[in-house]
Amino acid sequence: MAAVSLSVSTVKPLGDRVFIKVSESEEKTAGGILLPDTAKEKPQVGEVVQVGPGKRNDDGSRQAPEVGVGDKVLYSKYAGTDIKLGGDEFVLLTEKDILAIVN
């Protein structure tokens, strides 16, 4: 079996899935206290880096995704599959788990 080299450009989500680069979590509190890694909360904001072709409707047509590459999004806390690539954190989730586009 050949080894597969994964990178952001080689991951192509299927259906209505979205590949998101997770934003960095806060290093310190508003009061200036540094947080250890174990105390950091999982961020729920990230940037869309890849989008699938969309959900397939009952008639076979595709429903275009509402989000696009480059959108900053807020997503459900426990949604998706966490993936690490090249030291960065990503999450692969379905479009329905995206709560909002953040401007």
UniProtKB/Swiss-Prot annotation:
Localization: Cytoplasm
SMART domains per UniProt: Cpn10 (SM00883)
GO MF assignments: ATP binding; metal ion binding; protein folding chaperone; protein-folding chaperone binding; unfolded protein binding
Transmembrane spans: none
GO cellular component: cytoplasm
Keywords: Chaperone, Cytoplasm
GO biological process: chaperone cofactor-dependent protein refolding
InterPro entries according to UniProt: Chaperonin_GroES, Chaperonin_GroES_sf, Chaprnonin_Cpn10_CS, GroES-like_sf
Gene3D superfamilies for this protein: GroES chaperonin
CDD domains listed in its UniProt record: cpn10 (cd00320)
Keyword Plastid assigned: no
Principal subcellular localisation of the protein: cytoplasm
Job description of the protein: Together with the chaperonin GroEL, plays an essential role in assisting protein folding. The GroEL-GroES system forms a nano-cage that allows encapsulation of the non-native substrate proteins and provides a physical environment optimized to promote and accelerate protein folding. GroES binds to the apical surface of the GroEL ring, thereby capping the opening of the GroEL channel.
Quaternary context: Heptamer of 7 subunits arranged in a ring. Interacts with the chaperonin GroEL.
Similarity comment: Belongs to the GroES chaperonin family.
NCBIfam families for the chain: PRK00364.1-6 (NF001530), PRK00364.2-2 (NF001531), PRK00364.2-4 (NF001533), PRK00364.2-5 (NF001534)
PANTHER family: 10 KDA HEAT SHOCK PROTEIN, CO-CHAPERONIN GROES
Protein name: Co-chaperonin GroES
Organism for this UniProt entry: Parasynechococcus marenigrum (strain WH8102)
Lineage: Bacteria, Bacillati, Cyanobacteriota, Cyanophyceae, Synechococcales
Gene giving rise to this polypeptide: groES
